[in-house]
Amino acid sequence: MAELFTSQQLGPHEVGDPSPLAAAVLTDGNRVLVAVIAVVALAALVLAGVLVRQVLAAGEGTDGMKKIAAAVQEGAKAYLARQLRTLGVFAVVVFFLLMLLPADDWNQRAGRSIFFLIGAAFSAATGYIGMWLAVRSNVRVAAAAREATPAPGEPEKDLTLVSHKATKIAFRTGGVVGMFTVGLGLLGACCVVLVYAADAPKVLEGFGLGAALIAMFMRVGGGIFTKAADVGADLVGKVEQGIPEDDPRNAATIADNVGDNVGDCAGMAADLFESYAVTLVAALILGKVAFGDSGLAFPLLVPAIGVLTAMIGIFAVAPRRSDRSGMSAINRGFFVSAVISLVLVAVAVFVYLPGSYADLDGVTDAAIAGKSGDPRILALVAVAIGIVLAALIQQLTGYFTETTRRPVKDIGKTSLTGPATVVLAGISLGLESAVYTALLIGLGVYGAFLLGGTSIMLALFAVALAGTGLLTTVGVIVAMDTFGPVSDNAQGIAEMSGDVEGAGAQVLTDLDAVGNTTKAITKGIAIATAVLAAAALFGSYRDAITTGAADVGEKLSGAGAPMNLMMDISQPNNLVGLIAGAAAVFLFSGLAINAVSRSAGAVVFEVRRQFRERPGIMDHTEKPEYGKVVDICTRDALRELATPGLLAVMAPIFIGFTLGVGALGAFLAGAIGAGTLMAVFLANSGGSWDNAKKLVEDGHHGGKGSEAHAATVIGDTVGDPFKDTAGPAINPLLKVMNLVALLIAPAVIKFSYGADKSIGVRVLIAVVAFVVIAVAVYVSKRRGIAMGDEDDTGARPEPADPAAVS
């Protein structure tokens, strides 16, 4: 990373010197290629429609199962509708703010704002469609499992075939979400390139920002909703009342199942969609500089191949009798997709790209045009790094989170000595695993970076290509992730209805265990995708400040270069920016976890109140008021959205206009470094606690109802906001901050140097940004105090009578 800050070897493009080389254009041949890629994207959407019909054709089970599924559908729909209305207002405000930022012309400025709305709409649509199908397929998975234990008079089914059918329904549901993710992401990027040609990278900044902002809000909001309900349900239900998970007597059960869909399904779908969009943004910006004309089409060709191989991978998940578990079939689909992607990319590279850098048309950097070597080798190896990185992270994350591996078994053993040792063991595992994962991602980034040799822009483009390589697996990755909440919900519906017992219940338990593993694995790969996208955007940011400095007659390095423009970590302002970037990640994580804590507290008091005031709930003579808990989670999730979102947008603005673009670059580097470690730590520690609980529930160390079980439940409740709220939300946070920095960089330079220099404007903007952050954090902290005040006045229910909960 030091080279990014101190590089002295700058080509003509990088220092703004005039170059006789022609600028990149979208040739007729490339226009046809991009149009074909757009057709591939549309084919993905068509396949999604076919898979929807297949999933919905399955049976829905008993009336009791249908009734519970309808309640989950209603809650999820109501929450997302309210969330999207709130975000719609925010998106309109940002649309007009983007119009104020500098651009080459009004056409580019309008396009950036319009495609911001399109990116936001696509991101929201991906999440909404994923949720819509997930809440309909869960009951179908439960109904399929029920065939293993048919009612009197119904024919018996082969247990293996029943398990395979349930697995296929759940995974095909994920396949729909995966196809929408890659289809809409690729279609949006192709439309921008076809309409704006060589100006497409600038317009795509708006598309990427729209996708990233909505994804971050859906991640944070969905995470708060799902984990508030989950923590509240576990603390009162399992720990205090000693009733099973998803017991219909627990008032938080429906909210918990709703949360699985709005958090794990809608949130992750939007998250990976924006990773897809943002990686393409960075790859096209850098590709235009590094590969000229070819750089406007090749970054789209790689994920287009990924769309085709994702189709193969989804259908390759066809369970066999020889499979040890559903995970074997899912792994087979993933690796089949990855291997075919690598082979097809190799073919595409050698067919599409020329054999020398001199033959790349439209490259304005003389250092790249004159470089020896074969650009096809660089492109192939960079993409291969991304694909291999996805496979390695899948294995590494699985090692730290699967119930059959030693780390989770060790945490299970610590449950014999109480919850404190469970929590300590999980934190230790998370910290250790973060190091290995971060080193693996770092090696991937550095390996791609080395491919560029002495050209910084070529090296950064290689990093972006590694990101597109990782994107080739996204279709299957999204399918794997959606499999988790669908199987979890299916087990919940079966438990609440009481209509699935014996072998059928065991089928669902096994599917849920596989789902926990797939969720943990996809979180690891999502983090890698986010880091590669952020690193590539960092390169795009460097290109933006290079161009901006040239426009005002300044240079980035060497004698006479302004301190605020130099990306040199030895400069005090840059060091402050680096520390601030790392601090922003910690503040964001703290705000998200605290929001879950507050909301979960409200859920706990509500569930306790219902048990106390409606004693008939325990003997099934009274029904809990499920809707009250859903309302609490919805209200708190939407209320808590603002502070983390404002921090992500305003922090780069404050640093940039206060300390300059050099410090802003350091801020991004600090955020990427700290964010990588924090996201992996939170995801893996949370995942390990969850599966340690599953391990005990399967009969180890005393099984359900034992003290060891209570200890692992406490560990799981601590890990819930780690792995499902704060950890995943760091992914879009990094990209939002990078995109905001990329968009404001020209304005920071404009008001710092040249004819438009204005210290007053810089100070005003910086003060406004700081005040917005300070007020948002203050209001957020005040909410916690207000909760305590309400307790003092008696508005909050008194703790339950020990006799009632023993």
Language-model region placement:
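Hydrophobic packing and interface segments
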Residues: 2-806
